[in-house]
């Protein structure tokens, strides 16, 4: 055994995150976990066998709270606030409005119009190579080999967590091994960096397939109500849509994902939209 580390051992910010610092590197004692992939503590060992034996000795007492399981529950006035310290006004991360021309008037005057409800499920990215990072002490900071999709985001969030200037955190990105959006957030990089910084030893953190599925964010489920209109010749004239996206427990890149969904909703075919 090398050591067991908790949120109390983090020298800088416990929380990280691309758009909002809402994701705990480790959940402090007495705080709230938000999904199955939240880290409670880190265990470092010389061999996988010792690591598994040590993991089996960890006991956690949970108080079960009422979960919020979809965006429609989260939108209710009496819904629990997911991140009250960061987003005290509610559970909505982002609004997007795209308006071009007077779509409502054109729809009303079009020969044909169709309104349908569509849903897409969350999607596992299923990249071939699993998340892995190797970190080592380097010049009063850390050097990280990573295989993520955001080298500078990894540097920024690890330096914030360690309380170091960015130049003390060097990140070299190796081959990603597939990502498709599933490796944009930090997953193992900050944990490897923290243990390497604390122990002054090289550290590898690698997820199994089941751990990977549990930990990394998924493609966002969406609920869409779309009205599409066309003229008597079948030429599309305008579109109106409402899109609700589920970014899950944390902000991640939920705002830009919603923006992209709205931007692409009409494809290249319609110049009059209201989304």
What residue spans do the PLM features occupy?
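Gly/Pro-rich active-site capping loops and adjacent beta-alpha segments
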Residues: 12, 50-72, 96, 153-154, ...
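Short acidic loop-to-helix transition motifs that present clustered carboxylates
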Residues: 9-12, 128, 151-152, 176-177, ...
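Flexible, low-hydrophobicity surface segments
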Residues: 1-90, 113-116, 198, 264
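Helix-loop-helix junctions that connect adjacent transmembrane helices in secondary transporters/permeases
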Residues: 80-162
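Short coil/turn connectors at secondary-structure junctions
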Residues: 1-2, 30, 37-40, 46, ...
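Glycine-rich and small/hydrophobic secondary-structure elements
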Residues: 21-51, 180-232
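Beta-strand segments within the central parallel beta-sheet cores of soluble alpha/beta enzyme folds
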Residues: 7, 167-174, 201-210, 237-242
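Alpha-helical support elements that line or immediately flank enzyme active sites
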Residues: 1-7, 42-61, 133-199, 256-261
């Amino acid at each position: 055994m090398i050591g067991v580390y908790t949120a109390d051992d983090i020298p800088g910010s416990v929380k990280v995150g691309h758009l909002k610092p809402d994701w705990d590197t480790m959940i402090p004692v007495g705080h709230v976990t938000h999904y199955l992939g939240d880290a409670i503590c880190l265990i470092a060992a010389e061999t996988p066998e010792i690591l598994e034996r040590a993991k089996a000795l960890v006991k956690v007492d949970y108080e079960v709270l009422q979960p919020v399981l979809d965006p429609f529950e989260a939108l209710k006035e009496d819904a629990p606030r997911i991140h009250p310290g960061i987003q005290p006004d509610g559970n909505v991360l982002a609004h997007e409005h795209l308006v071009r021309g007077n779509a409502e008037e054109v729809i009303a005057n079009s020969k044909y119009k169709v309104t349908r409800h569509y849903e897409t499920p969350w999607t596992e990215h299923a990249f071939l190579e699993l998340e892995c990072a190797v970190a080592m002490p380097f010049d009063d900071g850390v050097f990280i080999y990573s295989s993520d999709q955001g080298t500078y985001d990894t540097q920024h969030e690890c330096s914030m967590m360690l309380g170091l200037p960015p130049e003390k955190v060097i990140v070299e990105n190796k081959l990603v091994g597939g990502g498709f959006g599933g490796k944009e957030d930090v997953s193992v990089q900050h944990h490897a960096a923290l243990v390497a910084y604390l122990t002054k030893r090289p550290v590898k953190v690698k997820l199994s397939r089941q751990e990977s599925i549990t930990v990394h964010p998924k493609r966002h489920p969406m609920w869409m109500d779309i009205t599409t209109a066309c003229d008597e010749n079948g030429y599309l004239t305008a579109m109106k849509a409402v899109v609700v996206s589920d970014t899950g427990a944390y902000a991640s890149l939920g705002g830009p994902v919603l923006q992209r969904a709205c931007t692409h909703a009409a494809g290249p075919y319609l110049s009059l939209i209201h989304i």
